[in-house]
Amino acid sequence: MQLYNTLSAKERANLIDQAGEVRLTLSFYKYAQIENPKLFRDYLFIHWDKINVLGRIYVATEGINAQLSVPATRFEEFKAILDNISFLENVRLNIAVEQDNKSFLKLKIKARDKIVADGLEDSEFDVTQCGVHVDAQSFNDLISKPETLLVDM
């Protein structure tokens, strides 16, 4: 089974033009404990390559960080693949406002040490322990307090 791209960027661009279909550009990330990033990488490649997903995805023991495009007609199928992965079920997908069918020309999924170059040592904390979601009013109330420090990443 092929787990890598065989077409050049130019060949892929021509195929995108010939297909004439609208693609959705989107991104998502999720901190989760992935025991075998290389195996997970291969799983994603096998499933996403079948539905013509293109993009740049990083997988590590700490989670996944993805920027990609998917044919609009295959979006529900793509979403179903995500929802079959327990920690990605109902993950928030950030769909780009401006679309470019050629935002990505290849599917590149890389197993890495980290999904974000943040300089932190993951062994010092549990990346799956996240904060509490607050609505807009609560957020505004929190940041209006002088003792609140807001870090925008």
Briefly describe each language-model feature range:
Residues 1-153:
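Cytosolic catalytic domains that perform sulfur/thiol-centered chemistry
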